[in-house]
Amino acid sequence: MRASAGERERVEALYAWERRLQRQGVARIAGVDEAGRGPLAGPVTAAAVILPPGLFIAGLNDSKKVPPARRRELAAVIKKESLAWGIGWVSVKEIDCLNILAASRWAMRRALSALAIRPDHVLIDGMELPGLKIPQTPLVGGDALSASIAAASILAKVARDELMVAYDAVFQGYGLAGNKGYPTREHREALRRLGPCALHRRSFKH
């Protein structure tokens, strides 16, 4: 289906930060975002993506604004069309040993390390990565401001959701395939009834 002029304009506007850096001579720009800071269960997942300059992907947006089925379609396109992409994970045990902010930063670092191409600059959603030896720009609400971060937000969300669906068959009774570990009413009721499983974060209030 052909994208409307308005949709093309919207997606092109997401490249404003990338174009600004490219005008300064920066070639390879990675967007980084995480998923899973708020759940009671499961890992924190991050993704890093380097897109070709100006690549048009119809529907590209902050993952929270994209329906699940469309997110999966977009993830496949992003993996196929990107110059490089990587996923980083931080386990429940690591989250409990660190804290959720530190765990999110570690997931982002691991996603960057998983890239087959080293970026020249990193656009990060909402936070800075201390000690990163690559120039970086943190953008609050970056998944709605940068195409690269939006692409990363989709990959991170899809990867984590798929894992939580798989975990639902192992840790039954918590509805993980539906709630993805987030603190829904049904999830909290299951916790009261069953107690926490190995996937639940002990450092979070249940």
UniProtKB/Swiss-Prot annotation:
Gene Ontology biological process terms in this record: DNA replication, removal of RNA primer; mismatch repair
EC number: 3.1.26.4
GO molecular-function term, one example from the UniProt record: manganese ion binding
Statement: the UniProt record of this protein carries the keyword Cell wall biogenesis/degradation: no
Ranges in a coiled coil: none
Residues annotated as binding a divalent metal cation: 33-34, 125
Cofactor: Mn(2+); Mg(2+)
Binding note for cofactor: Manganese or magnesium. Binds 1 divalent metal ion per monomer in the absence of substrate. May bind a second metal ion after substrate binding.
Top-level EC class as recorded in UniProt: hydrolase
Domain RNase H type-2 residues, every copy: 27-206
Assigned keywords, A-Z: Cytoplasm, Endonuclease, Hydrolase, Manganese, Metal-binding, Nuclease
PROSITE patterns recorded: RNASE_H_2
Swiss-Prot/TrEMBL catalytic activity: Endonucleolytic cleavage to 5'-phosphomonoester
Coarse class of the protein's main subcellular location: cytoplasm
One GO CC term on file: ribonuclease H2 complex
Locations listed in the record: Cytoplasm
Listed Gene3D superfamilies: Ribonuclease H-like superfamily/Ribonuclease H
Function: Endonuclease that specifically degrades the RNA of RNA-DNA hybrids.
Similarity remark: Belongs to the RNase HII family.
Name of the protein this chain belongs to: Ribonuclease HII
Species, as recorded: Moorella thermoacetica (strain ATCC 39073 / JCM 9320)
